[in-house]
Amino acid sequence: MAKQIKFDSDARSALQEGVDQMAKAVKVTLGPKGRNVVLEKSFGAPTITKDGVTVAKEIELEERLPNIGAQVLKEAASKTNDDAGDGTTTATVLAQSVINAGMKSVTSGANPMDVKRGITAAAEEVVTHLRNQSDPVEGKDRISQVATISANNDDAIGDLIADAFERVGQDGVITVEEARGIETYLDVVEGMQFDRGYLSPYFVTDSEEMEAVLEDAYILIYDDEVGNMQDLLPILEKVSQTSNPLLIIAEDVEGEALATLVVNKMRGTLKVSAVKAPGFGDRRQSMLEDIAVLTGGTVISEEKGYRLENATLDYLGQADRVTIDQDNTTIVGGEGSEEEIEARVNQIRQQIANSTSDYDQEKLQERLAKLAGGVAVLNVGAATEPEMKAQKALVEDALSATRAAVDEGVLPGGGVAYLRALESIEEVEVENEDQEIGVSIVREALEAPLRQIAENTGHEGSIVVQKVKDGEGDFGFNARTEEYGDLLDQGVLDPTKVTRSALENAASVGGMLLTTEAVIADLEDEDDDDGGGGGGGGMPAGGAGGMGGMGGMGGMGGMM
């Protein structure tokens, strides 16, 4: 297909046009009094949102060259969202300011490479300043403040997220799901839970709840199938002498072995239950090792020289309580050593850091949570489907921002952290006048977020910026109350990770567009039904989630 090519200022002007259109739609959502954006859907009701990344994802421009500029700006927003979970609108505002000021200077004859070097040097100095000024997040109240701000000042959501962090800890898994009703509430699963249920309903000890509950249980962990009862018999005899119940976790328990276990359970000879091992392939082996570390047991594996018929009580793990239903097994109070659990947790953290796969990182994070904390589910309710979608996106953003705050601390919000970082730019060393222009571009951009927040509130941005600059420390403009004061004391906070990532990505995208000398795109086609908007592409589709466990079969009881 024939292409169109634009060079120099023509290329940059076309890109800038797309940047401005994208930024104009996104930046109106910034701040507690940001405006709504209505998104048309191909089917169903339109979506009404104040979420910057949701707006950005929807934008595809009709003209191909401006659309490329819009998609490049979208990358700055999306990268910030990926890195820190929030800050997409701030990144958009910063990037637009850098790009527009940079385009003016390059058009006036400045060397774009030197301008870019100045931008990069200034941004790095500001990031260092932000890290040094960061205030660690400790305590439920501070976490609630951060979550509330990220949730567009919804106190109820902020309190729920703070409760979730308090219950499962920093390493716990917190997920967001759609509730079946209109209430938003928190569910917490303590201990280690995996998606495998009992292999026979005859293992149930609580017929009302249809659960098998084992107190002070031994746990046998075997990485192969159990079919021959003779292999299992020696360890069963040893456990029966202790009067403690036994949970068997194996690749499968079938035939004679399962039938014998059921008979012994029904006769009261042995308190026992059996479940399939969680996971598949290599991940199954890793999860069995996790269970062994948590409970102080050993994975019985012939590959490692352990045989089931030679197993002793020393091989078995122990837990205060095991609860098994048709679909899940939950182990609470595992008696593994704290040192070994901590070492295993650190090992998984390292694997997360080294992994390049989003899916692998997600599964590793789940394993980490099962060992180190627990699993909390925020169930989001709403009266209508559009409201549900918007509310869920809001909670997900707030959760991500809160995680970022716990990771790297917080700074005064409302754009104040950027203004206080202006002094650090004076220390940037430059080699020529064009690099100084790059530094000045960042200096100007640092004022843009507060200016936009003030304008969205209905105030004159320049006046608000000057008044805050005249103050010191955490003094700033609280857009929610439309008053000036100490923002940290008022709970107006931004996660350092979000503030930092927004500037880093804005500077990166800005420098890239300023040094663009040519743009190549398909020719405009009047007969093209899609309007030519697909050039830049939106976000790639997320990877499909795991298949989940198949649950217990539950039908083996007929062998009685």
Curated annotation (Swiss-Prot):
Key word Nucleus present: no
Catalytic activity, as annotated: ATP + H2O + a folded polypeptide = ADP + phosphate + an unfolded polypeptide
Record's subcellular location: Cytoplasm
Keyword Magnesium belongs to the record: no
GO molecular function: ATP binding; ATP-dependent protein folding chaperone; isomerase activity; unfolded protein binding
Subunit structure: Forms a cylinder of 14 subunits composed of two heptameric rings stacked back-to-back. Interacts with the co-chaperonin GroES.
Protein name: Chaperonin GroEL 2
Organism of derivation: Salinibacter ruber (strain DSM 13855 / M31)
Taxonomic lineage: Bacteria, Pseudomonadati, Rhodothermota, Rhodothermia, Rhodothermales
